[in-house]
């Protein structure tokens, strides 16, 4: 049975983890959200989130975006390549409803799977 938990080892926790991804990322994005990814040697994917107050003013909106992103990652974790991902929210992401945000994330995860197979 496949575990769909979201333990600590699936998260990017330190600034050095984020810097590693920002150095040579593979990008997949929409006008509202970008996912940067870089292959890791851990054998499983990890995720980090950046939702700036500058782009999403209200705390409850930032929390909603992070919650939906984590849930999308948690459900797809076994299909994703062994990469470190950083999800960057841009202006306008707060205007998306939950369904539109989830669909955008699914599309970006699929694109990263294709990018990983191609490299």
Curated annotation (Swiss-Prot):
The keyword S-adenosyl-L-methionine does not apply. It is an enzyme of class 3 (hydrolase). GO terms for cellular component: ribonuclease P complex. It catalyses: Endonucleolytic cleavage of RNA, removing 5'-extranucleotides from tRNA precursor. Keywords: Endonuclease, Hydrolase, Nuclease, RNA-binding, tRNA processing. Consists of a catalytic RNA component (M1 or rnpB) and a protein subunit. Belongs to the RnpA family. PANTHER family: RIBONUCLEASE P PROTEIN COMPONENT. This is Ribonuclease P protein component. It comes from Citrobacter koseri (strain ATCC BAA-895 / CDC 4225-83 / SGSC4696). The gene is rnpA.
């Amino acid at each position: 049975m496949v575990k769909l938990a979201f333990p600590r080892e699936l998260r990017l926790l330190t600034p050095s983890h984020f810097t590693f991804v920002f150095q040579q990322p593979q990008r997949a994005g929409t006008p509202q959200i970008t996912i940067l990814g870089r292959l890791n040697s851990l054998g499983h994917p990890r995720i980090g989130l950046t939702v700036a107050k500058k782009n999403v003013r209200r705390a409850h909106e930032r929390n909603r975006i992070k919650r939906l992103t984590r849930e999308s990652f948690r459900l797809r974790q076994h299909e994703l390549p062994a990469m470190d991902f950083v999800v960057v929210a841009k202006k306008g992401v707060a205007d998306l409803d939950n369904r539109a945000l989830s669909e955008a994330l699914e599309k970006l995860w699929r694109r990263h799977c294709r990018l990983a197979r191609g490299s």
